[in-house]
Amino acid sequence: MGEYARSLAIATGAAARWPNSSIRFMLSREAPYAARAPFPATLLASSPTHHSAAVIELIEEWRPDVVIFDNAGRTAQLRAARRCGAAVVYISARRRQRRKAFRLRWLGLIDEHWIAYPEFIAGSLSVFERFKLRIRRRPRVRYLDVILAGDRDSKPDLILDRVGLAAQGYVLIVPGGGTGHPGGEATVAHFCAAARDLAAAGFDGVFVGPIQPEADPHRRLRAFGTVPQSELAQLMRGARLVIANGGSTLLQAIACGKPCIAVPIAGDQRERILRCVNAGVAMGAAPDAASILRAATTLLADRGSLDALAGRASDLGLTDGIEVALRAIDGLIAANCG
């Protein structure tokens, strides 16, 4: 999940939990989502990481209780937040940012370090990381596991009625954007072809992605450019099988207890997929239409394997990262007020 989508999910949860709270984003005005951000936003010429003066000025003027740096941030920005009395949260989504958060000078600036994946994906704290935490006695480290918008107990009936499908009767195909990764667009096209071929083979499907499959003469395939995260979660819960990239979409499907086929659209996803395959919660497929189709038809023909994948996914017990974040924020605000 991208930094903005993750932060937006947390902010939306915070606004629902604390209706009187004030929430503000700092975004690049060049980002495609900047113009439609649902919260007040300060727009900068590029990533806020590169505009420390503007970030520091806003922190000093606004004086927030909590500042969240999602996979970005400069030392001067963190220091400004601490100087103004704010609790500082840093979210790391990659190894480089995780190493950055464990630098000794940053350990003294961060109150909470949230790792943006489950422990079995991101890895347990190393001996050296634990040693540093013992020395500095901070920050608190948490794994967000998975960001899954919407009520976990909600039923998918509404959106399924809209698309004319029955629960457990369709395959959900979600390639992700792919546009930010070399070769990503080509892989998304392979997802499209596989979705079309599955429909031709007699399987109902829902495709959610930026490239739309060719018209399905059998009308078994429903295609959407985008859907809200809450509706995507409902589609996952109602699916018989989910075919996804190796990013956050895969983890969301696993958290829903669904059998998954994972296809990498970026280099860093291969290791993530391998960890899921080794944990028995996903099946991998090469990023080409024939391999995706073969994996899907093989799995769909084997009810025992489908059920086994779903069972292991449910047993993994991934926690709701939004709830983890909100509990942490509540504790930080209580500590600051105390």
Predicted features along the sequence, with ranges:
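Active-site and donor-binding regions of nucleotide-sugar-utilizing enzymes
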Residues: 1-17, 24-133
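Conserved donor-nucleotide binding/catalytic region of nucleotide-linked donor-dependent transferases
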Residues: 283, 289-290, 295-314, 335-336
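C-terminal alpha-helical cap of glycosyltransferases
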Residues: 318-338
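Short acidic-hydrophobic, aromatic-tinged amphipathic segments that line or gate anion-handling sites
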Residues: 42-50, 222-227, 282-288
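Acidic donor-binding loop of glycosyltransferase active sites
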Residues: 237-247
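Donor-nucleotide binding loops and adjacent catalytic segments primarily
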Residues: 161-238
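A nucleotide-sugar donor-handling region in carbohydrate enzymes
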Residues: 109-177, 210
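Catalytic binding pocket for nucleotide-activated donors in carbohydrate/polymer assembly enzymes
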Residues: 250-294
